[in-house]
Structures are given as C-alpha cells and as structure tokens.
Amino acid sequence: MGLDVRNNGNDNVEIRAAETRTAQRADEALETAADFAGQPKVTHTMRTINRTLSRRISRNTGSEQVLNLRRLMEKYLEDTRFKDDFIFVAVDPNQYSVPYPTLVVMSGAKVGDHNHFFGYVLPLVAGLAPLPRREEQGPHGNILVPRTWVDNLNGTFINEVMAAMYAAIGGKSNGTARIAGLAVVTNEITAESAHLATTLLSAADNAIQTAIEIRLGDKLGLPQFNLGMMASDQPISSVQYNTSGMQDSDIVGNPVRSDITVTISNRIRQAMSDYDSQQRLVATTGYIDLTYSPQNPTFNQGPVLVNGYPVPPTVQYQPRYVMTSAYPLELDAFTPNTFVLGLIGTIATLNSGMAWAQSLISNAARGIGPHNPGALAMVLDPEVTAPLDLSTQTNEQIYKFLQQVLYPSLLISIDVPEEGEYSWLLRMIPAAEKIYTGKVEGEVREISEGYKALYRAFDDVTLGCFSKKYQYGLPLVYATGNRIPLGHYNHQDGHRHDIRDMDDLYMMNITNPDTVEAWEDSFDRTDMTMSQRVVARHEIIDRVLSGSWEQTGWAMRYDFDPLALQALIEAAADAGFTIRPENIQHLAGTAVRGNMAARARGLGNISGNIYARSDRPNVGVNNMGGAFNLF
C-alpha cells in the first residue's frame, strides 16, 4: 500500500499500558484529534489517575478480550500478503476516557507524500450491564428515555479513539486519521472466536477500502461500479418470502427481520457449455409494515385517486417496505454504488405486479397469528371484533380483500443502524436528507457532502442517466423522525427474533384497538418529541412481551422520495439495465416497473402524514462526531 508509517512501536502482540505512547504524546494526540473532529477538548481525570497508578496487568477483563481479538486477526493475516497493511490499536479504558475496551483496525493509502489512515472501531461490551435510562424533561414532566451501549459512543469517545490512532502513527505529522466505521461487539471474545474475528476483520477491511474510494478515489483513479459492468440482458432478480420463521442475522449474530429477501445476480454465460452460471451480487432484506393514512376525513374532497383511478373509501393504510439490511453476496466490496444496485433491484422486483403483497398473502396462509392480515377485517367492519382466518382463501381472494383497505402504492423506507457492519455506508442516507449545508456563496447555496454522495451514486450507477431525469438539489430522502429500537426477543418457535416483529399487524392481532392507536401514535404524532414517542413505544413492547426482550441498538428510519425512485428506475432502464424476475407471483397484471413510483407520487400529494417528521429537535439522537462521517 506504500504507507510510510505502520505500527510505529505497536507491533508487539502483548497489550501494555505504555506500549506506544508516553503521557505527553497521548495528550498531544488527543488535542490533535479534538481539533480534527471539531470537538471540544475535555479533561480526562480517570485516565490520568490510572496512568499514575497503573499496573502491568489490568483488572479490566475487556483488555483480555481485546487481546484475544487482536491475536486472532493477526493469526489470520500471518500467511497473507496483507499482514503488514494493518495496524491494531488497543484503546484501554484505563488509559483513555472510553466506556468500553476497544480495538481499532487501521489501514490506509498514500497520496503523493501524505498518508491517509482509516480506522474501523470495535467496542467490546460482552458481559456489561445495560445502561440506565436517561431522565429527560418533557412538556408534561420528566420522562426516562431508554439507552443502549451506542449512546455512550459520543464525541468524547471519538476524540479518545482518534487520540489513540494518532499516537499509533506517531502524530499528525505522519498522516491524517479518520474513522471509517464502527460496530459494537456484544459477543464474548475467546481463543475459539476465530470465525467471528475473521468476519470482523473482513468488515473492517471493507469499510476502510470503501472509505479510501470515497475520500481518495478520484486522486487514486479507483474504479467505481456501474451498470455498464453488467450485460444488459443478463441481470436476474429473485425474491424469497420467508415462511420458515428463521431470520437473517447481523455481523454479531443479532436477528434481523427478513420477511422478504431480494437478490440481484448476474447471469454468466459459459462458452462451449449448455448451461449458464449465476454470480450473486447483492441482497436486501425487509418486511411490509402498514401506516395509518385515512382519506382526509376532515375535508370535503372528492375520492382519492391513485394512478388516475379512485380507491375504495374503505382504504386507510399505506403499505411500507422497510429495508432492514443490505449486503454483498459473492462480491467482496460493498460501496455506495453496489448499494444502489440493490435498491434498484428491490424497487423493480417488489413493484413487479405488486409482488410486495405476496408477503402479506404468505402470512395469511399461516392462519391466525401475529402477522395475519385478516386483522384488517376489523378496520373494514366495526362489528368484526376478532381477526379473520384467511388460510382457506385463494391468493386472489386474499388480494381482493387487501385491496379494500390498502393503497395500491408502496412506500420505500430504510432503517439505518446507528452502528453496525455497514452503518458507515448507510450513513449517507441521513447525510443526504440535509440537502444544504447552510453556507451561501453569492446566490448559490452549498450542497451537503451526503447529498452529493447519494446523488452521485444514483447517477454513476445509471451511467449519467439519473441526472438527466432528476434535478440536482431536489429531495432524495426524508427523515421520519423515528428512532427505532433494535434488539431481540424469544419467539414461540424457539428462536430469537428481531424486535421489529412488533409492527402494526402484530398489534392488531395480539392487542386491542386502544393499544393499536397508541402504537401508531408512537410513530406519527408530530406533536410529541421523538423521545416521548420512543418511550411510548418501549412501554407498549414491554407490556406485550412482559419485559422479556433485549435492546441492542438503535436505527433511524428514512423514507425515499418516490419521485427520485421513479427517476432512478427509469434511468436504470435508459442505461440498458433490464431485470429478469424469477419466482415472482404477479398480483396486478403485467410487470410495469414505473407504476409503483407513479402511484406513490399521487398518494404523496394527498397524504402528507406519511412523512411523519416532527418539527421538534431530535433530542437524544446519538452524535458520533464529525470524524465519523464519511459523507
């Protein structure tokens, strides 16, 4: 990689308190990090005491886990040509003001005479007690807001981690350091954790290499993925509707709701052969949720039109596809452009003949249960007091039933984890929500880096066709103002399930109308602060599950602008990209790729409450500091 500075005294496998720094160097590096991150300098009393009264072996067992993880990663790299490309930096709570023992995996690239280092941060929290709730003042009294480990990873944490990174490379004069990504490790790390260590190292390398492409790609001449790399008549999309109850999992084994999995593959024609092979490129997972959206009952207006046709007056719910994860399959790299490929495939596939509705039909086939759409019968007829069993109905009959209560358009949303394997990449979604920075030069407002990154990815992937259809500066995503708890509970099938199983249909089937209304208000009541809605949602989950669930993190939910998605799909088609859908059951005629976006656009004009954005500040949102943001 041509870097001048590698471990710089941090090569020894054993982790000792003064291994890579003197007290003076650590303080100087900390000040450098604070300047670089734009964060205030802070006093580090605990670190100073521990440094004065230090011992060669720490009582903090987390240090042993950091050592185990580092050893396993170094062992994996021993026989590779990349073993000298990585720096492993231990950030010990006894030496730095960090809440958890942390390992930073560093690597980078050289541009001219300057070294650029990027670090992937792995806080280890196994065995630690949950954080106590934070008291927050609300308009009607104080509330206790739930917290998870990520809530401690604030600007001070970033400063301290960067201080350790700068100390490891010998200071700012030897290069620039940035944080490429962060994933909290909840697993206990032992000598037997080789597979997990390799997985984490792979995630770190992916994040670092993508950070290099984002920050330095133009200077280094690095290639970017686009649709021109795929033969126009070969891409294949397939969709799987999860009927087994088994769910995907994230990098540390937490379940991820995956009712729907969309996979994009490239069909590779074999010369002199009677068969073709497929290379699976990228996949997305998610589920269909419902958002209450009545037809303007307070106004005397005509019938609601979707795609030029009136919808039945009984229609009250907007279907929403919530993307819970996106990840590469047989690709090693995951970049903004390959994410956009997955997004294109997901939109086109689920909109193919309203294929998204098949997920609800699959749930109906299971009969009475927590996600049975037969509960919508109580919406259609007040005299119906219990969910209907639709398992004996045909698919066509169930679909006609759904048409009576659901809008025919699909809202596309994504949950962006505040930390996790690919949170560093998905952070371009919230970064893109803020279109302008607030700076004005002349009469031109400055566009934010996040917006530039997402718009550029849309345009690059479609070979420049997106910019011909969608004006630069128009919205790409909207913040819903909802902080979504991530975690798991023990399902009756004996497996751990994603806490996002708790959705509108779940509440309709398991609880009562008052709880359903309170649940919907916890997402849509813009007169409540985000913290108030989070607390209300937590209280409902606690009641339904009798408190037997564990929260592991947070995600922020964003909606994609339907006009931007329509332009993206049309741009992909103009770029010569055509998808061959496989194992998809059409429920609404032939597949017309642009119809979903057109229907959703019409719906957006008459039901603005779909985008439930609060005008109140998002108090309590984790702020990872400027150094963490690639965009």
From Swiss-Prot:
GO terms for cellular component: host cell cytoplasm. Keywords: Host cytoplasm. The keyword Secreted does not apply. The keyword Ion transport does not apply. It comes from the Viruses. It is found in: Host cytoplasm. This is Chimallin. It comes from Escherichia phage vB_EcoM_Goslar.
